[in-house]
């Protein structure tokens, strides 16, 4: 445990020695640092599109108990200490994907819609089509973390989310992935804990 924390501290020390993100507002800076640390990709310093007010509102919703939905088990595995709704490995999800001719992450999002309710935080890192499902379902999210990777449709899907007017954290390019999406969420949760908005005791009881 101590070795892991030391390695993490060293990672952030190296990051801050190589790039100055002080121009960014606090939440955007925290998210950007987490994403760069998780990916070792400094391009995210300019590739991520963050809105401080959107992140602040989502942080408040998180503290109030907002549901968190992921499009895949890989994204869910990267979110430690916060309960998530993830339907990607349910038998019903596989059946829906086959009958509807859609991907498993898209089917997982479709099935999670009824359980999550309005105000949820949707974390998508595996499949661009999952973002299409979110837009089609009128989910009324507090935040869509839309960071799937892919050469076929990922950048376009993220652009569509931004154009939709949904509160979103996305990036411009085709890059992304489960680890990046999970890191962005964990950054938000970490910031909420540090500010006192999110109480660790309450978090562990959820």
Question: Would you name each region that the model predicts?
Answer:
Residues 152-206:
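C-terminal functional extensions of proteins
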Residues 61, 67-108:
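Glycine-rich, small/polar surface segments that engage phosphate groups of diverse ligands
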Residues 1-69, 78:
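Electropositive, gly/pro-rich neighborhoods at or near active sites that engage anionic ligands
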Residues 38-46, 94-97, 119-120, 143:
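Short, basic, glycine/proline-bearing loop/turn elements
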Residues 143-152:
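ADP-ribose/adenylate-binding Rossmann-like module
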Residues 89-132, 176:
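Glycine-rich oxoanion-binding loops at beta->alpha junctions
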């Amino acid at each position: 445990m101590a070795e892991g924390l030391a390695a993490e501290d060293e990672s952030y020390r190296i990051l801050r020695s190589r790039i100055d993100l002080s121009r960014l507002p606090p939440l955007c800076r925290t998210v950007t640092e987490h994403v760069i640390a998780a990916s070792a990709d400094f391009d995210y310093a300019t590739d991520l599109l963050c809105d401080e007010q959107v992140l602040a509102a989502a942080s408040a919703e998180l503290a109030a108990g907002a549901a968190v939905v992921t499009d895949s088990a890989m994204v869910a595995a990267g979110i430690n200490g916060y309960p998530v709704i993830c339907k990607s490995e349910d038998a019903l999800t596989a059946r829906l994907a086959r009958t509807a001719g859609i991907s498993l992450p898209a089917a997982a999002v479709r099935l999670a819609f009824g359980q999550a309710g309005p105000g949820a935080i949707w974390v998508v890192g595996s499949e661009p089509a999952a973002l299409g499902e979110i837009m089609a379902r009128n989910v009324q999210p507090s935040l869509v973390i839309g960071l799937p990777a892919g050469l076929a449709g990922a950048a376009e899907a993220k652009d569509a989310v931004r154009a939709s007017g949904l509160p979103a954290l996305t990036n411009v390019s085709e890059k992304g992935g489960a680890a990046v999406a999970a890191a962005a969420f964990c950054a938000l949760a970490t910031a909420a804990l540090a500010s006192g908005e999110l109480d660790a005791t309450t978090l562990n009881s959820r």
